[in-house]
Structures are given as structure tokens and as C-alpha cells.
Amino acid sequence: MSQGMRLGIVGAGPTGKAHAAAAKQAGFRLISAADRIPDRLGALSAEFKLARSVSDAEELVHDPDLDAVSLCLPTHLHTPIAISALRAGKHVLIEMPPATTSRDAKAIARTAEKTGKIVLYAAVRRFGSAEQSAKQAIDKGYAGKIYHARATWLRTRGVPKGTGWYSDKSLSGGGAGVDLGLPMIDLLTHLIGSDVTHVSAVSHCCVTGLPVEEFVHGLLRFESGASAEVSVSWAMNQIPSQAGTTCRIHAQRAALDIYTPQGPVIYRGFENAGQGKPTPMKQPRVAGYPALFRHFKECIQGKTQPLVGAEAGVKLMQLAEALYRSIETGKTIEIKHKTDTDKGS
């Protein structure tokens, strides 16, 4: 690995292209890619001057010339391909959501434990520059204890494009709830520094007519005592100013508005003026996917532990299942996280 860790990309669509560009920026050597669609496989291979391109993911993950693979696949393929890659001695980065079920996520975690290889989930929002700045401010105690948060990711018309698997829950794990909601909830658990213990949620599908939810609103409670609201949509008839992404943190001594045109802003001084004074926060230079891949490389090198590793993926899928149980039953669901990889369910 002295000349750079050798990486293969499984899935040559837009996400695979983003992974390839970020991995190259992070210092990986891009060796090969796999995809069943010849045109996009050829385009990715040509753009990044890959030595090999194959149609079969299994062939790629068993290539002895690779140290790691990045999986940019339909969600139902994450588990079988990740397990094959781990057994073949590869470290694995997997796009979100982790799997279609917590059982599948546990299977990945068990295999990672047995093989001693790294699994990292692409919770890329944790690595954004604004999010990193907010996390640093929170960890340094500038805001005090967090008691509430609000997060939204609202698209007016933004149903994922593809071959239709996004709208088949057996293939995707769900609709907007897992596609947009899970990354936002993961970000909140990261910022608050606490696991979700209870979830209550509702969903709607009034615009697209899809068989999965296009809108989800949830209320979360955390071990720390904090609460949070999360709203996400693929397609929503809304006032233009509502569209986009927001994340606002309310704490004992300050409030944080993470997504503003000026970048993340912390409001302090409420006790003196009754209205907080905004102060823009400094942001790191490297963010998003490049920061994610640098973290992946450091995990492989043994310099740090995965920020969202195999066990975290199990927790995320348990949370997703609780979200859907609440939607189906109309009840608040308690989450008792069980990540014991020795058990199959």
C-alpha cells in the first residue's frame, strides 16, 4: 500500500462517479469499476483511466489487486456484495442506507467482525464543512446542553431517478424516510451525541402516487433527554422558501443554524438582549465525500475507528424499522438497540 491504497468502485452511476472523484482526491489509487450498464461503466472507466472494468460485482470484489471497495448499489445488493468483499479480504465503504433490514445490517457486522476488515457507511452529512463546524462548537461546550433540534430535507420535485428500485420497499428499504430521513436523523444523533430511544412518525404519498412514502415527519426522543423534529420529502407542494435543507440546534446557552447562505451560524447572548447575536463559524477546507474517503483511509491505516461503522449501521436500520412501525401503527415506538453480532436477529 506504499503507493496508495487500491480501490474498486461497484456501481458506475452518479454516486459511483462522486465516490471515484472523492477517493482520488483522498489519495486512493482507482484500479477498477463494475457495472451492468456498459455505457456508464465505459464512461467512468474512461474519465478516471481505470485499468479494469467488469460487469460482475463479484468478480471485482475478488480481485487480489484491490485493498478496498466502494459500494454504490441498489440497497438490497449491499448485504450480499459487502459480505463477499469482506470475505475476500477487502475493506468496504457502503452508501446509505446501510441495508434493507436490521437483520441484513447485522449480517454485514458479523462478517466484518470475523474478517477483521473495516466497514464504513457513507453518512456523508457528518463530513460536510458546516456540520463539522457545528459539531466542533458543540463539543467545545459553546452551546451548552442540547434540548431540542429541528431538521428538514424538503424537495418540491426530487424523486430519485433510476430503474425503479427506489420505489420498491423490498429493494430500497423504504421511500423518503430512509433515503432522506435516515441521513438527517444520523446527523442529529451525531450532533446531539446521543442515541434515539423513541420515535413517533407519520407519512404521506399525495403527489407522486408511489407505493412508498414521499413525505415523512417524525418526533424523536434521545437518551440524553433531548427531542427533535425531522421532516423530509421527495415531492411536496410547498412555499419556495421552505424547500431545501435545514438543521437548527437549540441548547442551554446558544442556538445553531447550520445551513445558511453564510454557512453555519451560532447565536449567543440571549440572556443579555433576549435576542441572540449571530456569529458565523469557521469551516474546514475539506468536506463531504473527500473528507469521508480520507476518514476511510485513516480507518484502514488503523489511525482511527469508523465514525459510522458496522455496528452503527445496525442501529440505523433498527431506527428505520421503528420509524416504519410507528407509521403503520400510529404509536410511539421505543428503540432498544441490540447490536450483538453473535445473534442473527
Give the role of each language-model region:
Residues R125-L210, G330:
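Predominantly a Rossmann-like dinucleotide-binding segment in NAD(P)-dependent oxidoreductases
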Residues M1-G4, A68-L71, K117, E223, ...:
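C-terminal helix-rich "cap/oligomerization" subdomain common to oxidoreductases
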Residues I94, V119-Y121, R150, V230, ...:
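Hydrophobic residues in well-ordered beta-strands that form the structural core
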